Swiss-Prot record:
Protein source organism: Methanoregula boonei (strain DSM 21154 / JCM 14090 / 6A8)
InterPro entries: AAA+_ATPase, AAA_lid_4, DNA_helicase_Holl-junc_RuvB, P-loop_NTPase, RuvB-like_N, RuvB_C, WH-like_DNA-bd_sf, WH_DNA-bd_sf
Gene Ontology terms for molecular function: ATP binding; ATP hydrolysis activity; four-way junction DNA binding; four-way junction helicase activity
Organism classification: Archaea, Methanobacteriati, Methanobacteriota, Stenosarchaea group, Methanomicrobia
Lineage top rank: taxon: Archaea
Region Large ATPase domain (RuvB-L), annotated ranges: 1-181
Protein name in UniProt: Holliday junction branch migration complex subunit RuvB
HAMAP family cross-referenced by the UniProt entry: DNA_HJ_migration_RuvB
Length: 335
C-alpha cells in the first residue's frame, strides 16, 4: 500500500519532502495550539538554560511530527539524532545511541510505539534521572553497570498513542496531539510548496488540491507534484482549478479526496450489505485487501469524515456516505 497516491505514509515520490519542510515555527503552517505550546516550552527552556522537556507527538501520519522535532532542535540550538522504534530491538541499541548524546541534544524516535518493550523500560531512568543500567555478561556472572548520560531531550512520534504504556507516556513533559489540517491551511501549504518548487499555480488551483488532500500536508505536496506533470502535458504548465480537477480525476481522486478503493469499500457496505453492519474481514475479502490494511489505512479517514461508523456488530455507512455515492439504499435499523 506504500504506492497509494493518497497514502499518508511516505512513498518514493516524496523525495523532495525534506526540501519543502519549514525550518522555523513561524514558517510552519497550521497546528496553532501545538505551536503555541511549543513556543512557550522553548522560550522557558532557553531562559533557564536547560534542554527542553521530553515531548511526545501523537496523531495521524503526514501531519508534521518529524518536521516539528527538527524545528525544536534548531530553535534550541541543539543537534538532533533520529531513529525509529522498529530498529531499536535490543537494550544495547539504545545504550549505544544514548551514551553518544551530548548535553542538550535531541533524540527523535519515530514510530516510538513499535519499540521493543525491553528497550522502552531502560528509557525510564534515562528520561528521569539521565542514566541507564546495562547488563554485562550472561548467566550467574552477569552484572549491571550504571552509565551516566548527558541531559538530553527525547522526542517521540506515534500514530498509535494507545499502544504506549502509561508509565512511558507519563515520563513525557509535553504530550502534543496533531490534528488534520483545515482546507485553508492546506491551501497555504500548497501555495508555499509551489513557490519553492517553482510551479505556477493559481489560488483556485491550490484550493482544489487542498480540498482533496485529506487534511494531510504530505498528501497535498504529493498531489501538487502529480498535477504539475498533468499541467505540463495537458496545459501550459500553470495549475488552474480546471487543470487540478482534471489531473486529480485522472488519478481517480474525487472532491473529498477519496480514491477508487475508498469508494469500493463504501459501495460494499452500502450497496452489497444494505448499509451494514458488516465485519472488516468481509469488507477486506470483497475489495481484495488485508483486514489490517482496511483497519489501519482506509477506515480511519472514512470514519473521520463521518462516512463510516464502527459498531459492536460491524461497520455501517452513514447518510452522508450514501449522498456522496448517490445511492438511495436505506440504512438498516438495529434493534
Amino acid at each position: 500500500m506504500s504506492e497509494r497516491v493518497i497514502s499518508p505514509e511516505p512513498v518514493p515520490d516524496d523525495a523532495d519532502e525534506i526540501t519543502l519542510r519549514p525550518s522555523t515555527l513561524e514558517a510552519f503552517v497550521g497546528q496553532e495550539p501545538a505551536k503555541n505550546a511549543l513556543r512557550i516550552a522553548i522560550a522557558a527552556a532557553r531562559k533557564r538554560g536547560e534542554p527542553i522537556d521530553h515531548i511526545l507527538f501523537a496523531g495521524p501520519p503526514g501531519l508534521g511530527k518529524t518536521t516539528l522535532a527538527h524545528i525544536i532542535a534548531r530553535e534550541m540550538g541543539a543537534a538532533i539524532r533520529t531513529t525509529t522504534g522498529p530498529v531499536l530491538e535490543k537494550t544495547g541499541d539504545m545504550a549505544a545511541i544514548a551514551t553518544a548524546l551530548q548535553n542538550g541534544d535531541v533524540l527523535f524516535i519515530d514510530e516510538i510505539h513499535r519499540m521493543n518493550p525491553v528497550v522502552e523500560e531502560i528509557l525510564y531512568p534515562a528520561m528521569e534521572d539521565f542514566f541507564i543500567d546495562v547488563m554485562i555478561g550472561e548467566g550467574p556472572s552477569a552484572r549491571s553497570i550504571k552509565l551516566t548520560l548527558e541531559r538530553f531531550t527525547l522526542i517521540g512520534a506515534t500514530t498509535r498513542q494507545g499502544l504506549l504504556s502509561s508509565p512511558f507516556r507519563d515520563r513525557f513533559g509535553l504530550l502534543i496531539r496533531l490534528n488534520l489540517y483545515s482546507p485553508e491551511d492546506l491551501e497555504k501549504i500548497v501555495t508555499r510548496s509551489a513557490e519553492i518548487l517553482r510551479i505556477p499555480i493559481t489560488p483556485k488551483g491550490a484550493a482544489v488540491i487542498a480540498s482533496r488532500s485529506r487534511g494531510t500536508p504530505r498528501i497535498a505536496n504529493r498531489l501538487l507534484r502529480r498535477v504539475r506533470d498533468y499541467a505540463v502535458v495537458e496545459g501550459d504548465g500553470t495549475i488552474t482549478a480546471e487543470i487540478a480537477g482534471a489531473g486529480l480525476a485522472l488519478l481517480q481522486i474525487d472532491e473529498l479526496g477519496l480514491d477508487d478503493i475508498d469508494r469500493r469499500i463504501l459501495s460494499v457496505i452500502a450497496g452489497d450489505f444494505g448499509g451494514g453492519p458488516v465485519g472488516a474481514k468481509t469488507i477486506a475479502i470483497s475489495v481484495g485487501e488485508e483486514v489490517r490494511t482496511i483497519e489501519e489505512v482506509y477506515e480511519p479517514y472514512l470514519i473521520q469524515i463521518g462516512f463510516v461508523k464502527r459498531t459492536p456488530q460491524g461497520r455501517e455507512t452513514t447518510p452522508a456516505a450514501l449522498a456522496h455515492l448517490k445511492l438511495n439504499h436505506s440504512q438498516k435499523t438495529l434493534f
